[in-house]
């Protein structure tokens, strides 16, 4: 009863542990994965010299848990219903598809099958003979039985990426929104420009980790308002820092006259993302310019 007011959804529930009065058992009661209760229970039990009690099925059967994977890689999950289907399929011994827009380190966990953007299994020929990879049409020439792949995980920054009938999207925070604007541009105009970026690109808003601009805009109320609304930091750079950014950018004589640098939105986005790759070049409308860059990001499997 005491925790009832705090129980809302799997994505926001807090970690809750229960310890008996003798300190013999530490039970992970709520939010074992996303909230970190399972890991906390193990650490607490070690300190108390108690017995940890973890009841989540994927942990008991040593199966891949998409919510744990997302948390360890600092990603957001979309479609928790599909995430449950992933766990259920793995526990039932079925294959689960895995597609990623990003490179991966380590081997895929047991039960996951690497797929392309259309949900079709793909495989490396490194350790398979040609005969092994062409056993029958049921194996689609990949060495993997395709008939049981009904659900899967997609690591993506795009809202439209759904390779599987039931797709769990895992979205990394790796994008930077570069912005420039007229002085004292209203917050509504800034917000509308940002929304148009999402509409045009199909990027998840949750894939953005920061907003970037020139230091002349560090007190720009409209951008500060967007930063607060999206709950991400707003970073700025000097004219000299932006000039040093390598690459080819969309020049503007007017912008250079005002700021001293030929482009603000593209250069600031690239610089903030660690000299990352431009995913959307400069677009301008109603006194606001925007660009999107992505920092280098990889998936890590233990």
PLM feature segments, named:
Residues 1-38, 43-78, 85-218, 295:
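Conserved mixed alpha/beta catalytic, RNA-binding, or beta-rich assembly cores of soluble enzyme
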Residues 38-44, 74-85, 225-239, 261-266, ...:
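Short, Lys/Arg-enriched charge-dense amphipathic segments
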Residues 43-52, 82-92, 235-244, 266-275:
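Short, surface-exposed, charge-dense and proline/glycine-enriched linear segments
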Residues 151-163, 167-170, 269-302:
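C-terminal edge-of-domain segments
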Residues 187, 221, 300:
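Short acidic, gly/pro-rich beta-turn/loop elements at beta-sheet edges
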Residues 195-196, 206-269, 273-278, 284-288:
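C-terminal non-catalytic interaction/assembly regions of soluble proteins
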């Amino acid at each position: 009863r005491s925790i009832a007011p705090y129980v809302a959804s799997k994505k926001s529930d807090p970690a809750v542990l229960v310890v008996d009065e003798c300190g013999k058992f530490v039970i992970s009661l709520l939010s074992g994965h996303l909230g970190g209760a399972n890991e906390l229970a193990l650490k607490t039990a070690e300190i108390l010299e108690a017995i940890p009690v973890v009841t989540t099925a994927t942990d008991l059967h040593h199966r891949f848990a998409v919510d744990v994977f997302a948390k360890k890689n600092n990603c957001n999950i979309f479609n928790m219903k599909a995430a449950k289907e992933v766990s259920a399929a793995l526990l039932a011994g079925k294959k689960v598809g895995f597609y990623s827009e990003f490179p991966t380190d380590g081997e895929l966990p047991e039960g996951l099958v690497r797929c392309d953007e259309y949900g079709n299994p793909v495989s490396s020929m490194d350790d398979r003979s040609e005969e092994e990879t062409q056993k029958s049409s049921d194996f689609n020439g990949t060495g993997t039985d395709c008939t049981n792949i009904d659900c899967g995980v997609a690591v993506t920054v795009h809202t439209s990426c759904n390779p599987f009938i039931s797709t769990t999207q895992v979205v990394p925070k790796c994008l930077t929104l570069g912005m420039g604007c007229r002085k004292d541009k209203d917050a509504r105009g800034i917000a509308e420009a940002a929304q148009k970026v999402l509409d045009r690109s199909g990027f998840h808003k949750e894939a953005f980790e920061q907003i970037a601009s020139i230091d002349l805009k560090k007190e720009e109320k409209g951008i500060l308002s967007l930063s607060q609304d999206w709950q991400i930091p707003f970073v700025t750079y000097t004219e000299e820092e932006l000039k040093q950014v390598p690459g080819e950018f969309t020049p503007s004589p007017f912008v250079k006259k005002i700021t001293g640098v030929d482009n603000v939105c593209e250069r600031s986005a690239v610089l903030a993302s660690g000299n990352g790759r431009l995913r959307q070049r400069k677009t301008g409308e109603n006194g606001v310019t925007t660009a999107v860059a992505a920092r280098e990001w990889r998936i890590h499997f233990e």
